[in-house]
UniProtKB/Swiss-Prot annotation:
Monomer, homodimer and heterodimer with SUMF2. Its cofactor is Cu(2+). Keywords: Calcium, Copper, Disulfide bond, Endoplasmic reticulum, Glycoprotein, Metal-binding, Oxidoreductase, Signal. Ca(2+) 1 binds at residues 257-258, 271, 273. The gene is Sumf1. It comes from Mus musculus. Its EC number is 1.8.3.7. This is Formylglycine-generating enzyme. It is an enzyme of class 1 (oxidoreductase).
Amino acid sequence: MAAPAREPALRCCIRLARVFLLLVLACEVAGSDEAEAREGAASLAGSCGCGTPQRAGAHGSSAAAQRYSREANAPGLTSGPRPLALTKMVPIPAGVFTMGTDDPQIRQDGEAPARRVTVDGFYMDAYEVSNADFEKFVNSTGYLTEAEKFGDSFVFEGMLSEQVKTHIHQAVAAAPWWLPVKGANWRHPEGPDSSILHRSNHPVLHVSWNDAVAYCTWAGKRLPTEAEWEYSCRGGLQNRLFPWGNKLQPKGQHYANIWQGKFPVSNTGEDGFQGTAPVDAFPPNGYGLYNIVGNVWEWTSDWWTVHHSVEETFNPKGPTSGKDRVKKGGSYMCHKSYCYRYRCAARSQNTPDSSASNLGFRCAADHLPTAD
């Protein structure tokens, strides 16, 4: 009975979220020409649960990072099935790294300047939170996501059935491939006629920042800071575009789930996926993290700002307040001509109540959570 009284407020929130997304996507389109123009320069920026058995590189040593990079660039690399580990967290060692870049590809995102950052050791989920993980949380708590409360979420048009599209009469003006779909949520990623059947090991979608925090709290974890996330993404390598080096496809091999073809009209799926990939797809980076770029955007704990000090910082946590939260890593929808944000230094933002069909998360922790 309380729902009708809540409905006007929800409609207002939905309108605000849609306006914000429109602005963000407009910025993405505006920045695409610059990103494309800088492609050559980017290529020349540098050379190219608990107690589980540890994967090679899980401790994040420099040797592991260099081995990962060498393997990525070595001939004849093949990718076979990799079983999920018994625990979902790997240790990330304390260290110092260069955060951001002095060669920003999308200036308005605040990628610059490069600055020296020190982080303490912590733990990071090896995988993005999966549908199976999130379902355990929902079954345990009865939690309703914000997309479920609002009654809709944004879905990429290319993933929708014709039946669903016939009921949609609006789109984001600056990016008409984004459609607000009634009934779209984590259980129904492409709308009411879709399901997560056979996708239990894919990343959970349509989770807002608030939803992600709720899950992390339940799991005895937290969201990573932007600095922790970027440090983890780099996997022990310094000043590289991607977790494995500077070449997107070393020796023709795919290391991330991003868009292939002409966005948004044709995705060839050359990497094996046209939508999300399983959370254990593709080789892990030097710290043992899978899909740290591509697949789905990942929330961080930081409030958004584009102003950064060049002074050295220790365990930075971002601004103390704001209206948007930082997300990192890009998604399966990212293409260099449109959204060149699958680089470690790249970043974007969204309101804490926003959700979409390419947005997920992974957790961090200061210590390994104890089992109940």
